[in-house]
Amino acid sequence: MKIDFLTLFPEMFQGVLGSSILQKAQEKEAVRFDVINFRAFSDNKHQTVDDYPYGGGAGMVLKPQPVFDAVEKLTAGTDAKPRIILVCPQGERYTQKKAEELAQEEHLMFICGHYEGYDERIREHLVTDEISIGDFVLTGGELPAMMIADSVVRLLPGVLGKEASHVEDSFSTGLLEHPHYTRPADYRGLKVPETLLSGNHAKIQKWRNKESIRRTFLRRPDLLKNYPLTDEQRKWISEWENE
């Protein structure tokens, strides 16, 4: 996979892309990152990329020219066009399902904006996806773009140590993940559940499933609305509702 980031602040990406899973993914040649300062594509001598909004108002708006030229140059000569992603509060809410969808692509391109917003022609004529990571405002699109890229890259084949790792993550199954414990079994009187020490894999799996359902019920009950609950799982929920 190839992932491009169009940004005015390329230095923001150095630590994230050069660390942890994203670094390992590059070493395994599962992904290639390119960080492009689209100011370099500005067609005026001062390399300005923003201007005042027509009709007045506060703030500055990103001009279409530098972004259009950057995208067109980066995609010239390629048959398969990338998914061009605009990260903005107006976009669709990002989910694990969307991450899985994007992980099937060969080329992603993020447009990371700043200032008051984008010229609408960027949104209408370049962008294939508008994505929001939540109902709050950030200074720019760099942090959301890195978050989305991280969630996508870890799904690529061979990136994680165990292929089952991401399948068991919260949201991958439609539920929040069950609790985890490691040694020691007794720390300051706080003990690991006996079931996990039993060696009985069937009991352990049932415990994990029940705790996953419980945690989802308590913290994100909205996720259960479309989850195909078994009769036993419905019984558990009924018991918790009556506690």
UniProtKB/Swiss-Prot annotation:
Source species: Bacillus velezensis (strain DSM 23117 / BGSC 10A6 / LMG 26770 / FZB42)
Subunit and interaction comment: Homodimer.
Function statement: Specifically methylates guanosine-37 in various tRNAs.
Broad class of enzyme this protein falls into: transferase
Reaction(s) catalysed by this chain's protein: guanosine(37) in tRNA + S-adenosyl-L-methionine = N(1)-methylguanosine(37) in tRNA + S-adenosyl-L-homocysteine + H(+)
BP terms from Gene Ontology: tRNA N1-guanine methylation
Database matches in InterPro entries: Alpha/beta_knot_MTases, tRNA_m1G_MeTrfase_C_sf, tRNA_m1G_MeTrfase_TrmD, tRNA_m1G_MTases_N, tRNA_MeTrfase_TRMD/TRM10
UniProt: S-adenosyl-L-methionine binding residues: 113, 133-138
Protein name: tRNA (guanine-N(1)-)-methyltransferase
Keywords attached to this entry: Cytoplasm, Methyltransferase, S-adenosyl-L-methionine, Transferase, tRNA processing
Family: Belongs to the RNA methyltransferase TrmD family.
GO molecular function, one term: tRNA (guanine(37)-N1)-methyltransferase activity
Location in or out of the cell: Cytoplasm
Main location: cytoplasm
Listed EC numbers: 2.1.1.228
Gene Ontology annotations for the cellular component aspect, listed alphabetically: cytosol
